[in-house]
């Protein structure tokens, strides 16, 4: 019971973060996420983000896409959000800007249909081979 109350309170705080963001969360599109190029500097590859993306870094945004879970199970706290449905692995785009890592504040129920999540956008600038985008403290705002 106490854990359920704690999870509900955490979800409410994240929802407030998205709802109370100055002027509301920005609606982010996959076209905007495609505004990135890769440069080669000092033997490493580094993303070069557009000024529009840089302005959204560390801001509350919403993004619509399809869940691609890392783990089995119905409850997901960390997953990929894809521009395209994951029903057919051969149909997915191979480009990094077509995916965003989502770290949910509370577990989200896995669904096949498109969802909209709200979270804090992080531009991933390191050369770790990770994705280019991460949404943290994310909550589902629409299925």
Question: What is the predicted function of each stretch?
Answer:
Residues 21-143:
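OB-fold and OB-like single-stranded nucleic-acid-recognition modules
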Residues 1-5:
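Positively charged n-region of N-terminal signal peptides that target proteins for export
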Residues 6-17:
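Bacterial N-terminal signal peptides
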